[in-house]
Curated annotation (Swiss-Prot):
Entry's EC annotation: 4.98.1.1
Pfam families: Ferrochelatase
Pathway field: Porphyrin-containing compound metabolism; protoheme biosynthesis; protoheme from protoporphyrin-IX: step 1/1
Lineage of the organism: Bacteria, Pseudomonadati, Pseudomonadota, Betaproteobacteria, Neisseriales
Protein's GO biological process: heme biosynthetic process
Top EC class of this enzyme: lyase
Top-level taxon: Bacteria
This protein's name: Ferrochelatase
Subcellular localization: Cytoplasm
GO MF terms, alphabetically ordered: ferrochelatase activity; metal ion binding
Organism: Chromobacterium violaceum (strain ATCC 12472 / DSM 30191 / JCM 1249 / CCUG 213 / NBRC 12614 / NCIMB 9131 / NCTC 9757 / MK)
Catalytically driven reaction(s): heme b + 2 H(+) = protoporphyrin IX + Fe(2+)
Main subcellular location of this protein, as a coarse class: cytoplasm
Record PROSITE patterns: FERROCHELATASE
Residues that coordinate or bind Fe cation: 213, 294
């Protein structure tokens, strides 16, 4: 059966109160830490041409013939190790961030807003949340991917999906996007404060590892600014913490496949620090605003094991910003700046519009 050209939308009415929407978009998570739940999630994720840039036919054969028959079970074990009674950490943190953001914006005097969150892969989907926002009367929409550093495989694909959904609306809202916030002063200050807070409970480390999610190296060579933006975030964070160049290192994690990715690899950095008998290492992941599999399992568990098993001393993982009040305040500042000129929509405007329309014979 052919898919309808347009999505179902509420009937147009002159008397509805128009709102401005803010949609936070994160990567996503499976519905459960099981192989059954991981298979459709991984299929959606790894079928994205923004994520895997190789010819479609050979990749389809590899994905469906090999990866989806082996990786779901392996990944399920990793997810199970971080899953909480309430569910996926990433989902919980993103949901809380949206709720806290709405409250913070309200304290700034921005009340006529619909603030929500969606996932690029998995649930809640971008399509379902944009549909809900349209039902709430959203006619101006700010899309904010929760990736501080722009990359085609993260920020761009989130916006791709949002635009795909918007292209299927008859009554399309005005749209703005937040491309990145890697050098936003509030974001950097929140990161620095999070690290200083951690250091209050113990000695400063001999080395601070700033671990960012990796991407294939060829993407940098083809114009993706991600590597540069990670380096700038790291430099600004080091300056805020007054660190010398020998006191920190910027590295990249989560390599997938055999292609060369951005270097140095976090796993190799931790191994080398262990072999050097480094007494204390702290790891922070500035590219993630909410703790997830890549931070809680790959770094806090696997990274720790790598460092200790190669002779390292004390390993400490510094949590992501999550629900930190300073981070929520800085996020609200980013939103407010990008909503400039949009928040003047008033309920009275819709009432006046409806009255005038009815005078001219409108029935709704």
């Amino acid at each position: 059966m052919a898919m309808p050209r347009y999505l179902t939308e509420p009937a147009f009415r002159h008397d509805y109160a128009p709102k401005t929407g803010v949609l936070l978009i994160n990567l996503g998570t499976p519905d459960a830490p099981t192989a059954q739940a991981l298979r459709p999630y991984l299929k959606q994720f790894l079928s994205d041409p923004r994520v895997i840039e190789i010819p479609r036919l050979p990749w389809w054969l590899i994905l469906n013939g090999i990866i989806l028959n082996t990786r779901p079970k392996q990944s399920a074990k990793k997810y199970a190790s971080i899953w909480t009674k309430e569910g996926s950490p990433l989902l919980l943190h993103t949901r809380s961030q949206a709720k806290l953001l709405k409250g913070q914006l309200g304290e700034m005097g921005l009340h006529n807003l619909a603030v929500d969150y969606a996932m690029r892969y998995g649930n809640p989907s971008i399509e379902s949340v944009i549909g809900k926002m349209r039902e709430q009367g959203v006619e101006r929409l700010l899309l904010l991917p929760l990736y501080p550093q722009y990359a085609a495989s993260s920020s761009a694909t989130a916006l791709d999906e949002a635009f795909r959904v918007l292209s299927r609306l008859r009554n399309m809202p005005e749209v703005r996007t937040v491309r990145h916030f890697h050098d936003d002063p509030g974001y950097i200050a929140a990161l620095a404060a999070q690290i200083r807070k951690h250091w209050q409970y113990g000695q400063r480390p001999d080395k601070l590892v700033m671990s960012f999610h990796g991407v294939p190296r060829f993407t940098r060579d083809k114009g993706d600014p991600y590597h540069c933006e990670c380096q700038k975030t790291g430099r600004l964070l080091a300056e805020a913490l007054q660190l010398r160049p020998d006191q920190y290192v910027i590295s990249f994690q989560s390599r997938f496949g055999r292609t060369e990715w951005l270097k140095p690899y976090t796993s190799e950095v931790l191994e080398a620090l262990g072999k050097a008998k480094t007494a204390r290492v702290d790891v922070v992941c500035p590219g993630f605003v909410g703790d997830c599999l890549e931070t809680l399992e790959e770094i806090a568990m696997e990274g720790k094991e790598t460092f200790l098993s190669h002779g390292g001393g004390e390993f400490r993982y510094i949590p992501c910003l999550n629900e930190d009040p300073q981070w929520i305040s800085s996020l609200a500042g980013i939103v407010r700046n990008n909503l400039a000129g949009w928040t003047e929509i008033r309920a009275e405007d819709s009432q006046q519009r409806a009255a005038l329309a009815h005078d001219m014979g409108a029935s709704a």
